[in-house]
C-alpha cells in the first residue's frame, strides 16, 4: 500500500491511498468465493455454480463489497501510518475497482488544531453579586393570587383600567385592507398581560362600555411574522364589557388549597429559599459562560470547518424548535436565521473553541472524567430522581449520552480548577448583559 497526505488547509487533510493489484485481487476472490458458496443459481447445485456465472450475475454487488473491504482495511492502516486523528467523518472518493489492477481512493477530513495554552490561570472575570430583593417574594405571592383570581362583570359606569379584562371586538387593517387573522369577537383581553403588540392595551385603557376607538400602531421589528415586522397597522376596537379581577386573600384556608405550607410566614420562607437558589444558579451559570468566553479570548483556537458547520446547524435546529413552539412559520424562521447568522456562527465557534481548551487543560492537569466521577453522578441522579441507579447507568450506557455526560463532568472539573485562580470582579446584580441565542 502507498499513501500520502495533502494539506488542504491548516485543519483539513486529504489522504490518498493506492492499494496494490494483488491485494485488490485477493479481496475480489474472497468475496466471489463467499457468494459462490451462499447462492443458489438455477441449473446448478448450491455452491457449485461456475465462478464466471457468479461474476456475471453478482459483479456490481461484488464491486461494492470490495470497495468497502479495501477502504475499511487500508484507510485505518494509512491513518496509523501518518499518525492522523480525524475529527470529522471522512468524505471518500474512488472509482470502481477492477480485478488485477491497483485501486486508488482518497479520504478528506478535518484534524484537531494544535492547542497552545497561553493564559488560563488567573483569568479576570466579572461576576454578579448575589443580592436578594424581598419584593420578589411579594411578586410571587401576587402571582399565586392572580393564578386563582376570579372575574366579575363591572356594573358601574367606569372606564376600563390596567388589570381588568376587556371584552372586545377588534378588526385589523393594513393600508385600508383587512389584516389576515387580525380580527376577533368577544375577545377577552387582560390589560397589562401584553398579549398584543405594543400600544394596543394602552390604547384600550380609559375606554367605556360601548365605545369604539381606532388605534394607529406599528408592528415591532423583529416580529415573528417577518412580512409584518415594522409595518403600520390600524385596529378598530369596540369595548363590549368590563370584568374586574378579584384576588383571593392569603388566608390559611386559601393557602391550604395550594398543597404547600398552610401559613403565610412558612410560605414566604419557602419562596425565598427557592428564589435564592434560582438566582444563585443563574449567577453561577452566567459566570461559567463568561469564564469560558474569557478562556477562548486569551487562548485563540482555529475552528475546523466541519465542526463549525455541524455545531452551527445544531444551534439553528434548536432555535427552530423553540420558535416553532411559539408559532413561527418556515418563512419567518428563514428570515430570522439569515438575520442572526453571524450570531449563530460566533456562538458555535466559541462552543467548539472552549471544548478544545477544556480538553487541553484536562489533559495537562489530569482532570478527565474518571469512573469514580461517573459513579458519584449516577448515585446523585438516583437520589434526586428516585430512579434506580441501574436504570440510570443503562441510559448513560448509550454512546451519545455517555459522551455528553463524560464531557460535562470533565468540564465541571476544569471549571473548578480554573476557579481556584480566577480573579473575580464583583458587579451589581443585573448589570451584565448576557449573550444567549
Curated annotation (Swiss-Prot):
GO terms for molecular function: peptidyl-prolyl cis-trans isomerase activity; protein folding chaperone; ribosome binding. InterPro entries: PPIase_dom_sf, PPIase_FKBP_dom, Trig_fac, Trigger_fac_C, Trigger_fac_C_sf, Trigger_fac_ribosome-bd_bac, Trigger_fac_ribosome-bd_sf, Trigger_fact/SurA_dom_sf. Keywords: Cell cycle, Cell division, Chaperone, Cytoplasm, Isomerase, Rotamase. Its EC number is 5.2.1.8. Pfam families: FKBP_C, Trigger_C, Trigger_N. GO terms for cellular component: cytoplasm. It is found in: Cytoplasm. Its main location: cytoplasm. One of its GO terms (biological process) is chaperone-mediated protein folding. It is an enzyme of class 5 (isomerase). Residues 163-248 form the PPIase FKBP-type domain. The keyword Isomerase applies. It catalyses: [protein]-peptidylproline (omega=180) = [protein]-peptidylproline (omega=0). PANTHER family: TRIGGER FACTOR CHAPERONE AND PEPTIDYL-PROLYL CIS/TRANS ISOMERASE, TRIGGER FACTOR-LIKE PROTEIN TIG, CHLOROPLASTIC. Belongs to the FKBP-type PPIase family. Tig subfamily. Involved in protein export. Acts as a chaperone by maintaining the newly synthesized protein in an open conformation. Functions as a peptidyl-prolyl cis-trans isomerase. Consists of 3 domains; the N-terminus binds the ribosome, the middle domain has PPIase activity, while the C-terminus has intrinsic chaperone activity on its own. This is Trigger factor. The lineage of its organism: Bacteria, Pseudomonadati, Bdellovibrionota, Bdellovibrionia, Bdellovibrionales.
